[in-house]
Swiss-Prot record:
Protein name according to UniProt: Proteasome subunit alpha
Subcellular location(s) of the protein: Cytoplasm
Annotated Gene Ontology cellular component terms: cytoplasm; proteasome core complex, alpha-subunit complex
Family assignment from sequence similarity: Belongs to the peptidase T1A family.
An annotated Gene Ontology molecular function: threonine-type endopeptidase activity
Keywords: Cytoplasm, Proteasome
């Protein structure tokens, strides 16, 4: 995203709107999300799947140490695209909020409410001086009382429910694939394979999708949210 000299006076302060109604610092935060590794979520009647791509930015990088799918509570997980440090802060906040809710109310936090709490924090960082927006978008999904839920939170603090959503570098291509192939009545396995195929279409020539460069978390409407093992990921990748 490029801005001319006329815009420069408006992108220095987060609390000043430009004449066209933009907050340029928030727009810049969206650009950080677009540069992130491809991340997507799919929700059907039977399952919620969240997966995140892992890339080896350096030959010396231990890619196995990179975590892209996170457990927030027994019934809900998330992934993100954008600045990893910003994502880590919000994930820690979400985990603490989930734990406090359990301690106070003796029940799991609803996914809708947890997503709202995350988004409220993001929104606060768009209207105060001396801070900057979070340069990260989170995909949050899981199961509430047998009902599958999937949300995406934007750097602006807005959040929306989705049947399927993709963000990051390959977000456009993955979204196009999901729009053409999504069905609400897919089985658990079909939902997982749909998500993997959507990620596969984002790969550049010469790139391969292997169990070591993708993380997958899922929940069925009968069970809890959990992350797949390396062996489970390898088995599913053989089917696409």
């Amino acid at each position: 995203m490029a801005f001319g000299p006329a815009a420069m006076g408006y992108d220095r302060a987060i609390t000043i709107f430009s004449p066209d109604g933009s907050l340029y610092q928030v727009d810049y935060a969206f650009e950080a999300v677009k540069k992130g590794w491809t991340t997507l979520g799919v929700k059907t009647k039977n399952a919620v799947v969240i997966l995140g791509e892992k890339k080896k930015a350096s030959q010396l990088l231990d890619v196995d140490s990179i975590e892209k799918v996170f457990l927030l509570d027994d019934h809900v997980g998330c992934s993100f695209a954008g600045l990893a440090s910003d994502g880590r802060i919000l994930i820690d906040y979400a985990r603490n909020s989930s734990l406090q809710h359990r301690l106070v109310y003796d029940e799991p936090i609803s996914i809708d409410y947890l997503t709202k709490l995350i988004s409220d924090v993001k929104q606060m960082y768009t209207q105060h001086g001396g801070v900057r927006p979070f340069g990260v978008a989170l995909i949050v999904g899981g199961v509430d009382r047998g009902v599958t839920k999937l949300f995406m939170t934007e750097p602006s603090g807005q959040f929306m429910p989705y049947q399927a959503v993709a963000i990051g570098q390959g977000g456009y291509n993955a979204t196009d694939y999901l729009e053409k192939n999504y069905k609400e009545d897919l089985s658990v396995e079909e939902t997982i394979l749909l998500a993997l195929n959507a990620l596969k279409v984002t790969l550049k020539p010469g790139e391969k999708l292997g169990p070591g460069n993708v993380e997958i978390g899922f929940a069925t409407k009968e069970g809890q949210f959990r992350k797949m093992t390396l062996e489970e990921r390898a088995n599913y990748l053989q089917k696409i």
